[in-house]
Amino acid sequence: MFEVEVLNEAEFEIDEARLKMAALTVLARLRAQDEGEMTVAITDNDAVADLNRRFRGVDAPTDVLSFPMDSMPGDVPYLGDLVIAYPYAKAQAEREGHGLSDSLALLVVHGTLHLLGYDHDTPERKAEMWAAQESALIALDVPIEIVPALEDGVHDEPQG
């Protein structure tokens, strides 16, 4: 069984079950992993800006950061961590006219794909990632129109 832990670091208003389902939907649709763990941390802009500065050299908050992990042999496979800046995501949802729950689900789907090795650094890889993302969003009843909001953010996985 795959476990998704959601850490709501400031008791933001979130639908924890929907966030877990977003990650599990990606894993199921891609038949990626049947067993393992990952964490989704919902935090503030300052915490994400600090991580963005330390791991990407970008001195600004962003919507979501992905930190893939390598598991030790014999351990339960650990996919990695997602860190979402709730205030940033909320402002982005309001600016784009999307529901916050849908926006957070999109960020979990997008971040989980990064944990699985997907990226959008070339047109070909972006097309592959966006197709997988769209498939998961449709399964979650998230409107596809929400995806262009990602074009404005800087949310690639950190290096290092």
Name each model-derived stretch.
Residues 1-103, 116-160:
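An acidic/histidine-cluster motif and surrounding catalytic segment
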Residues 104-108:
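Beta-strand elements within well-structured catalytic alpha/beta cores of enzymes
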Residues 109, 113-114:
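Short active-site segment of divalent metal-dependent hydrolases/proteases
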